[in-house]
């Protein structure tokens, strides 16, 4: 299967988009490379890939995005995200929705802006909104995590606010996944490592509970969250602690099965495909690979060195 790895560095330091064929044993065969400054995140779309660039361009403080074909050869012109430090996006047909972390907004097609307001209790990280995640729900709404205000918000396709739900103050909601039946949301918190559970229906989330993650390092923070294809297992990565936690999932109940060393430093992103988990360890410039059996992780011997790996996308 094809996998794209994003190196969030300048071109002169090896930054760009790397394409590999990933074999069942975790071995990689390089298939392509596109040089670009500081790619932050990417999603699949009809045009190939839609890619966020964190680096501002042409004396503009805003981030940019562009499209590129799956062979990493043909690109569109850069477009502004209309905000600072874009960090996540989703594509719906011809529409692209982007969140700008520092600007605290959600932007559709570089035109329509939904500006978040408010703050929470963390003295430095929550003095203003910080949108960190956006994705389309199965019923056509757009879910957004606002770390700065501890809020899970839902918008319609024109970015009109549908509903909001709060997580515990100071926890800093970051990313989320839905259960396979669409009835539950599992959202990782960054500032206090933990997972929120919500019941979901028709663009509205009901907060149910938060499961805290025991950490040895008080500076640990939550990063990425993924669900296995069968919906039975939830995976959560923690930076500083440098682990991936594995939970058995049963509706609103999470049961910790394993806490696995990520094999590197700062597992900012990872993804699961079949019986493999691929982890991007940002600060150790290292991609690590894990075999999955009954949900549990076993680290494989092969590794890949890559400068500042920030994102992974399966083709």
What does each model-found stretch correspond to?
Residues 73-135:
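Asp-box/WD-like beta-propeller blade repeats and closely related beta-sheet repeat scaffolds
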Residues 220-281:
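Loop/turn-rich, solvent-exposed surfaces of beta-rich toroidal or solenoidal domains
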Residues 44-47, 91-93, 136-139, 180-182, ...:
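Residue-level detector of Asp-centered blade-edge/turn motifs that repeat once per structural unit
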Residues 32-37, 78-82, 114-115, 123-127, ...:
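Surface loop/turn motifs at the tips and blade-to-blade linkers of beta-strand repeat domains
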